[in-house]
């Protein structure tokens, strides 16, 4: 076993509180040295508390800097009322945080606003970052914080008839704390009435002087919607004048669950955030918890985690590529792709014991070591897959009909992608080579040799799918390096917060058994702090922002998923296109609704 390490031993870019980050000096030069409170955390970025009346001015300043913060990566809230470890922070009953990214600096900053329960108002950020729209709606819905000036502050995850704000600390977290649910005929009629679309509520006109618009309800059970997703189309003939995406049908309260599960027992829930990603989704969570605990895992653990993540990346990409081809009209490739995916599942099952949702990563390591014969199975897959991928490209993706349906369709540039918070292949198709595995390596990715495919400046449906093909080839390349260079050593860090003590130690020191009993029964107690980890997931950047209050459970678990941002962008991209183009566009985004709704 390796020795446990301290917080300072982790990679510098991940752990420095960035109190010396140049942006802090820039802000103080512009707004004065007393304008902010800088909060030390383990997020790896400067965390700055600003006053509500200065928020928009600060955000605009950051966006117009020579190396600007061009993307609003995340926005949400925290109920601070029960938090005990708040020394040095502004008094607050609630807070709102804004996570901004500068591509040119490859740096982030988090702005926080402290709010009193008597005055839960903050100005909307939609005039600075248009993608703040959905994030503010969800924050209002979950916490009751009003964003003054928001164009349509309404529920987004919960039914319109829902009462209360679920992420408040005084809101029940378990079904047993509610009265039994009874669906009467009257309540059913009320719920159905609430689903009726009223164009005027969204600033839409029912028609012009000469003709009426048609409103088409696509979903939430349409096969081309890729899940329980509804989108209302305002049509002039077959042309889309405008549209309104309607999400939330797959919402399961994943962030609320994080407040009622131990640090360890929450791992299975991470698999189901994006149910095709498997171990990929476990990665940011366990890395964020390891930052809180100050754990450095062995090299073997890093490499095993990378190997499992890339297997699931290939698995997800194969489904995406084949269903995209199916959406355009070709049925055969999807059946071939499932044969390939079965080989991956056989390999994953041999290693982890499970298929889609292994829940196999652990805080400080993995559940168990690699089994005998794993290398043979991986080698057979690496010999099999390249030829199959070539056949998909030759037989389907270079087909003139497919290209005619997808080239130039649903196109956007880099500026538009950044405005809407697009990440993953959609952003890289615009020519921006932002891949977290390269730009902000985690779990040893800096030790692997692979390329980041990029587009030529415009992200259209065809470019997005072809980039995924190239990403799949690079994942095969990474897997080959895992096969040939798997380090020796333990599969867990020797750390009291995560790993049972060796038997010989328990025979000498009774305290080790007491500690082990508490860890297993109540769960480990993580130091009070905040941590953050983003990763390059299958559909874009996925991240976990964890707040520990020195307890066995997370005080606040914020899950930022790429698909949420990507669906918000749909109206801006598809206006003026045909309904048939929308179907191809939806197929090119690569999303599942569990990733959107959490």
UniProtKB/Swiss-Prot annotation:
It comes from Serratia proteamaculans (strain 568). Residues 212-598 are annotated as: NADH dehydrogenase I subunit D. Coiled coil: none annotated. GO terms for molecular function: NAD binding; NADH dehydrogenase (ubiquinone) activity; NADH:ubiquinone reductase (non-electrogenic) activity; quinone binding. NDH-1 shuttles electrons from NADH, via FMN and iron-sulfur (Fe-S) centers, to quinones in the respiratory chain. The immediate electron acceptor for the enzyme in this species is believed to be ubiquinone. Couples the redox reaction to proton translocation (for every two electrons transferred, four hydrogen ions are translocated across the cytoplasmic membrane), and thus conserves the redox energy in a proton gradient. Keywords: Cell inner membrane, Cell membrane, Membrane, Multifunctional enzyme, NAD, Quinone, Translocase, Transport, Ubiquinone. This is NADH-quinone oxidoreductase subunit C/D. Residues 1-188 are annotated as: NADH dehydrogenase I subunit C. NDH-1 is composed of 13 different subunits. Subunits NuoB, CD, E, F, and G constitute the peripheral sector of the complex. Its EC number is 7.1.1.-. In the N-terminal section; belongs to the complex I 30 kDa subunit family.
């Amino acid at each position: 076993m390796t020795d446990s390490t301290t917080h300072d031993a982790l990679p510098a870019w991940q752990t420095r509180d960035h109190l010396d980050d140049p942006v802090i000096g820039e802000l103080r030069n512009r707004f004065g040295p007393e304008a902010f409170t800088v909060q030390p955390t383990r997020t790896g970025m400067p965390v700055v508390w600003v006053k509500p009346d200065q928020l928009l001015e600060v955000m605009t300043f950051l966006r117009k800097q020579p190396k600007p913060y061009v993307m609003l990566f995340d926005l949400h809230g925290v109920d601070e009322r029960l938090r005990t470890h708040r020394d040095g922070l502004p008094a607050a009953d609630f807070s709102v945080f804004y996570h901004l990214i500068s591509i040119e600096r490859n740096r982030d900053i988090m702005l926080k606003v402290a709010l009193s329960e008597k005055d839960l108002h903050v100005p909307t950020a939609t005039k600075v970052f248009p993608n703040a729209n959905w994030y503010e709606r969800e924050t209002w819905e979950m916490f009751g914080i009003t964003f003054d000036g928001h164009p349509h502050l309404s529920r987004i995850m919960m039914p319109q008839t829902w009462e209360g704000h679920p992420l408040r600390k005084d809101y029940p977290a378990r079904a047993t704390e509610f009265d039994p649910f009874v669906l009467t005929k009257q309540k059913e009629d009320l719920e159905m009435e609430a689903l009726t679309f009223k164009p005027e509520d969204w600033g839409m006109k029912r028609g012009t002087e000469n003709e009426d618009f048609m409103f088409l309800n696509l979903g939430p059970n349409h096969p081309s919607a890729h899940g329980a997703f509804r989108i209302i189309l305002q049509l002039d003939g077959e042309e889309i004048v405008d549209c309104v995406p309607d999400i939330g049908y797959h919402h399961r309260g994943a962030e609320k669950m994080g407040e009622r599960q131990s640090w360890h027992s929450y791992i299975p829930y991470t698999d189901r955030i994006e149910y095709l990603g498997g171990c990929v989704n476990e990665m940011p969570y366990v890395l964020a918890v390891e930052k809180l605990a100050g754990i450095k895992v062995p090299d073997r653990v890093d490499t095993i985690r990378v190997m499992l993540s890339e297997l699931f990346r290939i698995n997800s990409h194969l489904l995406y590529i084949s269903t995209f081809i199916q959406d355009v009209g070709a049925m055969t490739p999807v059946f071939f792709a499932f044969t390939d995916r079965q080989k991956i599942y056989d390999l994953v099952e041999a290693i982890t014991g499970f298929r889609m949702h292994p829940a196999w990563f652990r805080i400080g390591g993995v559940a168990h070591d690699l089994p005998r014969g794993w290398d043979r199975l991986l080698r057979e897959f690496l010999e099999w897959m390249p030829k199959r991928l070539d056949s998909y490209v030759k037989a389907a993706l270079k087909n003139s009909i497919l290209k005619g349906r997808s080239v130039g369709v649903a196109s956007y540039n880099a500026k538009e992608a950044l405005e809407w918070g697009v990440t993953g292949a959609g952003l890289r198709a615009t020519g921006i080579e932002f891949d977290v595995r390269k730009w902000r390596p985690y779990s040893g990715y800096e030790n692997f040799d692979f390329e980041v495919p990029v587009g030529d400046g415009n992200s259209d449906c065809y470019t997005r799918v072809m980039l995924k093909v190239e990403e799949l080839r690079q994942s095969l390349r990474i897997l080959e390096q895992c096969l040939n260079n798997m380090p020796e050593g333990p599969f867990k860090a020797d750390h009291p917060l995560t790993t049972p003590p060796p038997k010989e130690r328990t025979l000498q020191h009774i305290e080790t058994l007491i500690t082990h009993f508490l860890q297993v029964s109540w769960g480990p107690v993580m130091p009070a702090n905040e941590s953050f980890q983003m990763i390059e997931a299958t559909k874009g950047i996925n991240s976990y922002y964890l707040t520990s209050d020195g307890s066995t459970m997370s005080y606040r678990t914020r899950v930022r998923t790429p698909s949420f941002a990507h669906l918000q962008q749909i109206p801006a991209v598809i206006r003026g296109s045909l309904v048939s183009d929308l179907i191809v566009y939806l197929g090119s985004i690569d999303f599942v609704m569990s990733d959107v709704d959490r």
